[in-house]
Amino acid sequence: MTTDFARHDLAQNSNSASEPDRVRVIREGVASYLPDIDPEETSEWLESFDTLLQRCGPSRARYLMLRLLERAGEQRVAIPALTSTDYVNTIPTELEPWFPGDEDVERRYRAWIRWNAAIMVHRAQRPGVGVGGHISTYASSAALYEVGFNHFFRGKSHPGGGDQVFIQGHASPGIYARAFLEGRLTAEQLDGFRQEHSHVGGGLPSYPHPRLMPDFWEFPTVSMGLGPLNAIYQARFNHYLHDRGIKDTSDQHVWCFLGDGEMDEPESRGLAHVGALEGLDNLTFVINCNLQRLDGPVRGNGKIIQELESFFRGAGWNVIKVVWGREWDALLHADRDGALVNLMNTTPDGDYQTYKANDGGYVRDHFFGRDPRTKALVENMSDQDIWNLKRGGHDYRKVYAAYRAAVDHKGQPTVILAKTIKGYALGKHFEGRNATHQMKKLTLEDLKEFRDTQRIPVSDAQLEENPYLPPYYHPGLNAPEIRYMLDRRRALGGFVPERRTKSKALTLPGRDIYAPLKKGSGHQEVATTMATVRTFKEVLRDKQIGPRIVPIIPDEARTFGMDSWFPSLKIYNRNGQLYTAVDADLMLAYKESEVGQILHEGINEAGSVGSFIAAGTSYATHNEPMIPIYIFYSMFGFQRTGDSFWAAADQMARGFVLGATAGRTTLTGEGLQHADGHSLLLAATNPAVVAYDPAFAYEIAYIVESGLARMCGENPENIFFYITVYNEPYVQPPEPENFDPEGVLRGIYRYHAATEQRTNKAQILASGVAMPAALRAAQMLAAEWDVAADVWSVTSWGELNRDGVAIETEKLRHPDRPAGVPYVTRALENARGPVIAVSDWMRAVPEQIRPWVPGTYLTLGTDGFGFSDTRPAARRYFNTDAESQVVAVLEALAGDGEIDPSVPVAAARQYRIDDVAAAPEQTTDPGPGA
């Protein structure tokens, strides 16, 4: 392979009189194949540049090159853009807009908020409590939030619908402190910080948790990294609602506040390209660059602001840097030869952190003193003057200018990189210290210094009386500053954050819409994945509920048989379809549209869950209930994006999550990474997930109907359904006569009652794709081993477990009350014989109900890694096939003393259940996805 360097050498040595020079590779790696049509003019330009460099030096030469690039951009000359600029503010002083507020008034109550935020965390460390908290994050970002609260963040009563603000999790104390001044929270509630159950009257959650504070918080932003991901997809979903004509979101903006340390999370940056590709100019990231993460510097040897600027600019974002406060303006103006800018460019972040952990004299010597020219710039400044040189993120006007530029910018999302100091204004023991993130308390000396710098009217006596409980400060709702604060919120449409839980009601489809699924498939073999897709296809046809469905697919629509949705529903794309699809002449052509209904996310499960959350919480965010249906390979759901599903539960998302190609043995040939035998276990750990493992199409119909009623009915629940469906086709039976669906929804019902008169009885519990083998095992037991076995369909091991746990918890807490009986116990109480449970999942799945199964209980499952092979071979290996079930039943009967122990031994030998080679050949269709 010819390298770039080799091509460069070839280009230099291949000049000929008959062919103009061609520059193959420019030094920075940007390829160009344009011919040099005037070598003489080119030579003159290069000689002129060399002369300039020699006469004026590199600073002047660099400046002119940058100006030429800027002019080329203005003239729309197609050249590569620079990804990194000098370590100075993006917006020049002369272009800063007029600041519309009263800066003095806003500064005063900003100080009160800082004080109350720190005191709340400090008081939470009082003896007997000690629940932790974070003081320093909000201290560094107070100005960033307050500019937004006073001038940009619009509440839900705003005519445009209001903004969505993702607040950095560790900054929650400051948001509570503001709500205290607004009169939304009391001092008693602040004292309940991180004591949600033990504090009298209830407490406040540690971070933004909507489920724990449903009228206040909107967006959960811990764990770190999920905030930026979800903000991107929230902004995209706002456009989706607008483009489909569901809601006018054109005047709504999404703000996401982040920390520079958080940007190392893969989710923080991994989907930045989506914001650019979608042109999300309704989205602004504000990254608080205090240069510190939890234990130390983010980039001690580097420059995180420069790194993030290059990353986001390269990803197609508009980047605004807010590095220096107004006190630096005069120094930068006097920096005629660029010495100060050069110092700023070359000083690593570790040094900037150290400067703010010292004093003005240290900064004079170790920063300005590194160059005689910069040392001369500050020779008339005192050490205190130097110490008072603020960073940009603490300057109201600089921050306002950046926010105004961000909301006015069109065509791109914007990221604002604001430089701050962690622990700002908290005193010398906090500011810039590596340990500041873990510091929860202030000493008496710290309290007094903090009080003085913030000008809080609290006396020494009040602080000394009980240093564990320094007082909050509130001047009263009639104070001019508080009236000003509340006036600003009224003008902007109400309080932020605020979550509204009431939304418009939906008219659910009638039961007749599910009738086709309850008739069975006749002689046709149909996989439950196909049955599920057909169920939702029927729901989509409903004129009331259909437009509210949001199908979300990570590039597997054809695998799941959903390509038939492309022509009718179309794939959402803000730009429509600007090309001719290769399959345009086919009935099931790939069709994109700006009014498309399908969110086709590509190979991107993380982004798919982001869309699921945005759609599933639209009822609260927009008063527009939507019903997301997210379908994926089950192995790549809760295992890959379980953290996001936990956030979905916190945000109280509603919708359907479909784990397709489920099971450890069903997805033939795909192997270890695809063979899912445990997603139901992972789903069971999420309290908001209602998980089902249906075997038949009619069960799916009842489950979907129940899900719509529970999530979108008169009294909607804050849950989402997880339904595992399979790609193995088999005949779907019709709904039994006089069928009561309660068992389907509660988790278990008897599907097949043995009518044969046999010496012994047994019960087989089966779920999902294990059902056909269970029915065959029952036939074999009756025909060959004198055992009559009932077969039960277990649609939800998890719901049966929760029912049992709830009853036991009630008994523990109230032993004096009559005890309930778990549903599974009641179902099996009159069933004779041992109970054997089988599924295509790990044994731990059916083991969830062991405490409440009467009598002998034996479980079979697919423990261990999956592998590539046929279904019969895999099931023989895991011993979940019909033959293994027969042996398990006989073993249980022998253990109960009902048959001789030699019987299961003989059966095991007869069927060779320990020999994979003895498994039958695969006869069923391998199904899609294999």
Curated annotation (Swiss-Prot):
Catalytic activity: N(6)-[(R)-lipoyl]-L-lysyl-[protein] + pyruvate + H(+) = N(6)-[(R)-S(8)-acetyldihydrolipoyl]-L-lysyl-[protein] + CO2
GO molecular function term, any single one: pyruvate dehydrogenase (acetyl-transferring) activity
Comment on pH dependence: Optimum pH is 8.0 for PDH complex activity. Half-maximal activity is observed at pH 7.0 and pH 9.0. Activity is abolished at pH < 5.
EC assignment: 1.2.4.1
PANTHER family per record: PYRUVATE DEHYDROGENASE E1 COMPONENT (PTHR43825:SF3)
UniProt feature, compositional bias: Basic and acidic residues: 1-10
Function: Component of the pyruvate dehydrogenase (PDH) complex, that catalyzes the overall conversion of pyruvate to acetyl-CoA and CO(2). AceE has reductase activity with pyruvate but does not react with 2-oxoglutarate.
Keywords: Isopeptide bond, Magnesium, Oxidoreductase, Pyruvate, Thiamine pyrophosphate, Ubl conjugation
Lineage per the UniProt record: Bacteria, Bacillati, Actinomycetota, Actinomycetes, Mycobacteriales
Record's protein name: Pyruvate dehydrogenase E1 component
Cofactor: Mg(2+); thiamine diphosphate
